[in-house]
């Protein structure tokens, strides 16, 4: 799901803007960059921290709450380890429990990392192909 979403984001972004991508599957990042760099710059980064420090908008989608906490709250490589930016928007698209969502959002707010938005999505391969993603917030 993340691959198709990233494809749509890269295709719709300003062609001068850089899309920073990260995935535990490095070959997926390389494939994505190869396929879509004609739409604009794509940088593969090794951590969520690196991605967020270079971005005003962060969109993440991972399998579960443990993964969300790692992306955002890991003290070395997570978003929270980076430089604060009150204007940054952090859209977390995974479907996770309310307690975890609040925990992550409160921790990020306390550190001035930006606005955390719980944005679970309803998407399928067909919807992605049609550029349709339903966002619940």
Sequence positions of predicted segments:
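NAD(P)+-binding Rossmann beta1-loop-alpha1 motif at the extreme N-terminus of oxidoreductases
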Residues: 1-60, 89, 125-128
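Alpha-helical structural signal in soluble globular domains
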Residues: 8, 32-35, 78, 100-103, ...
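A short helix->loop->beta-strand "cap" motif at the edges of active sites that frequently abuts
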Residues: 16, 84-88, 111-114
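Short low-complexity, flexible loop/linker segments enriched in glycine and/or proline
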Residues: 36-37, 76, 132-134
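Short gly/ser/thr-rich secondary-structure transition/capping motifs
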Residues: 39-45, 69-70, 115-119
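Beta-loop-alpha module in the N-terminal Rossmann-like domain of NAD(P)-dependent dehydrogenases
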Residues: 60-75, 94-102
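Short, conserved loop/helix-junction motifs that constitute active-site signature segments
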Residues: 75-86
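Rossmann-fold dinucleotide-binding core
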Residues: 95-137
């Amino acid at each position: 799901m993340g691959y198709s979403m990233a494809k749509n984001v890269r295709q719709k972004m300003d062609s001068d803007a850089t899309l920073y991508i990260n995935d535990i599957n490095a070959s997926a990042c390389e494939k994505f960059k190869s396929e879509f760099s004609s739409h604009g710059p794509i940088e593969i980064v090794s951590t969520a921290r690196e991605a967020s420090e270079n971005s005003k908008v962060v969109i993440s989608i991972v399998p579960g709450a443990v993964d969300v906490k790692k992306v955002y709250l890991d003290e070395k490589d997570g978003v929270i380890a980076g430089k604060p930016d009150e204007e940054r928007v952090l859209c977390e698209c995974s479907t996770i429990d309310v307690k975890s969502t609040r925990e992550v959002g409160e921790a990020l707010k306390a550190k001035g990392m930006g606005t955390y938005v719980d944005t679970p999505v309803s998407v399928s391969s067909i919807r992605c192909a049609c550029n349709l993603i339903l966002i619940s917030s």
